[in-house]
A protein has these predicted regions:
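Nucleotide-sugar donor-binding/catalytic module of glycosyltransferases
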Residues: 1-219
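C-terminal subregions of glycosyltransferases and related glycan-biosynthesis enzymes
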Residues: 179, 185, 208-307
């Protein structure tokens, strides 16, 4: 191991990932100009995932530092539980899924961005099928990452996220939470506390879509219809409710602007009367999603008290 290279802790939660995890791990082991330590938490897989990981650990003992077999049955809690088992001795940290392919320069590129003054790196992905044939990209976002965006939208998957020790410590201190997803919560925490987030419009991950993905991509008409349905039945509202509960416990960590947004949006989404609402209320609070369509849906959800 080259001690002059940055040391990155890979935070990987697995469940029945035997079909693709070997390619995922190999793509991480082949990363340019970094050293990696794997921490893997397996949520009671039944398909041989653990055996594959153990074989890697036997072959590369210096790279595999933690392997845990748990019974949680929840990907978000599996990730956050694993965060609690890792120390803060690493230069950088990165979430990893079990079925993607990382570009060889993913970590090196992300670290370069972080070293320019950012705390959390995330980005777009290239969508591929089980045979790695490309068929699109995750949505392209152009508005800056901020808490005003994070409170209403997650802009990137955890499989793209790389972060410094400050974000890791913040996340570890706020990991015993009831939230929907580890990546959205990481984005919310980072922006709520005033840390700088960088969204990369150039993909560094092949995001594999197959029959067993926990979360699918956002592309395609059918997926958009599903998300509209979720909004109308109040699923997004329940997720945001959880975020508000957890943020209310750490208001002392929020910036002045974040707290203003937090309280004003809380008043707006919990108003007593359906029609007591105007577009000026949204502009005043400053919340926004990344696309025109997304902002239209946000306004509709707020109007219907489903935000």
């Amino acid at each position: 191991m080259n001690n002059n290279k940055p040391l990155v802790a890979i935070i990987m939660a697995t469940y029945n990932g035997a079909d693709f995890i070997e390619e995922q791990i190999e793509s991480i082991l082949k990363q340019n100009n970094v050293n990696v330590h794997f921490y893997i938490s397996d949520d009671d897989s039944t398909d041989g995932t653990l055996n594959i990981v153990k074989n890697f650990r036997q072959k590369y003992p210096e790279n595999f530092k933690g392997l845990f077999n748990v019974l949680i049955k929840n990907p978000c809690k599996n990730f956050l539980n694993l965060v609690n088992k890792i120390d803060d001795s690493y230069d950088y940290y990165a979430f990893s899924d079990q079925d993607d392919i990382w570009f060889p320069d993913k970590l090196e590129h992300a670290i370069g961005i972080i070293n320019q003054g950012h705390d959390l790196y995330c980005g777009r992905t290239e969508i591929v099928n089980s045979k790695l044939i490309s068929f699109g990209y995750s949505p392209l976002f152009s508005f800056p990452p901020s808490f005003q965006n994070a409170i209403v939208q997650s802009i990137a998957g955890g499989n793209t996220m790389v972060f410094n020790k400050k974000i890791f410590t913040l996340l570890k201190n706020n990991s015993q939470v009831e939230v929907q997803s580890h990546d959205w919560w990481t984005y919310i925490l980072a922006t709520f506390t005033g840390h700088k987030v960088y969204y990369d419009q150039n993909p560094k991950v092949l995001y594999r879509q197959h029959n067993h993905n926990y979360n699918g991509s956002n592309i395609g008409f059918f997926n958009q219809i599903i998300r509209i349905f979720y909004a109308l039945i109040g699923r997004y509202k329940s997720w945001t409710d959880k975020h508000f509960v957890e943020l209310s416990k750490i208001v002392d960590l929020g910036t002045k602007q974040s707290l203003k947004t937090f309280y004003q949006y809380g008043i707006l989404r919990n108003r007593l009367y359906l029609f007591k609402f105007s577009l000026n209320d949204i502009y005043r609070v400053g919340i926004y999603r990344q696309t025109t369509q997304g902002n239209l849906f946000l306004k509709l959800a707020i109007f219907l008290r489903r935000a």
